[in-house]
Amino acid sequence: NLLQFNKMIKIMTKKNAFPFYTSYGCYCGWGGRCCFVHDCCYEKTDIYSYSWKRQICECDR
């Protein structure tokens, strides 16, 4: 989800993802027509636990 994405970006780049990625590509805002399909995907995603020990995502092991 978006919060997990932001956390991953913060860990890897030391930057907050939202100011950098909300204007990335063709983003017309939450609920905008061009992003309707993309926004709907977030309701269908699975949330799971992960860690970044040794910079290896534990879910990839």
From Swiss-Prot:
SMART domains according to UniProt: PA2c
Catalytic reactions of this protein: a 1,2-diacyl-sn-glycero-3-phosphocholine + H2O = a 1-acyl-sn-glycero-3-phosphocholine + a fatty acid + H(+)
Active site: H38, D60
Biological processes, Gene Ontology terms: arachidonate secretion; lipid catabolic process; phospholipid metabolic process
Alphabetic keyword roster: Calcium, Disulfide bond, Hydrolase, Lipid degradation, Lipid metabolism, Metal-binding, Secreted, Toxin
Subcellular location(s) per record: Secreted
Tissue expression remark: Expressed by the venom gland.
EC number(s) per entry: 3.1.1.4
Molecular-function GO terms, alphabetical: calcium ion binding; calcium-dependent phospholipase A2 activity; phospholipid binding; toxin activity
Keyword Ligase listed: no
Disulfide bonds: C28-C35, C41-C59
Cofactor: Ca(2+)
Source organism superkingdom: Eukaryota
Pfam family, one: Phospholip_A2_1
Family matches, as PROSITE patterns: PA2_HIS
GO CC term (a single one): extracellular region
PANTHER family: PHOSPHOLIPASE A2, PHOSPHOLIPASE A2 FAMILY MEMBER
Description of how the protein assembles with itself and partners: Homodimer.
Family: Belongs to the phospholipase A2 family. Group II subfamily. D49 sub-subfamily.
Role this protein plays: Snake venom phospholipase A2 (PLA2) that displays edema-inducing activities. PLA2 catalyzes the calcium-dependent hydrolysis of the 2-acyl groups in 3-sn-phosphoglycerides.
Listed name of the protein: Phospholipase A2
Protein source organism: Crotalus atrox (Western diamondback rattlesnake)
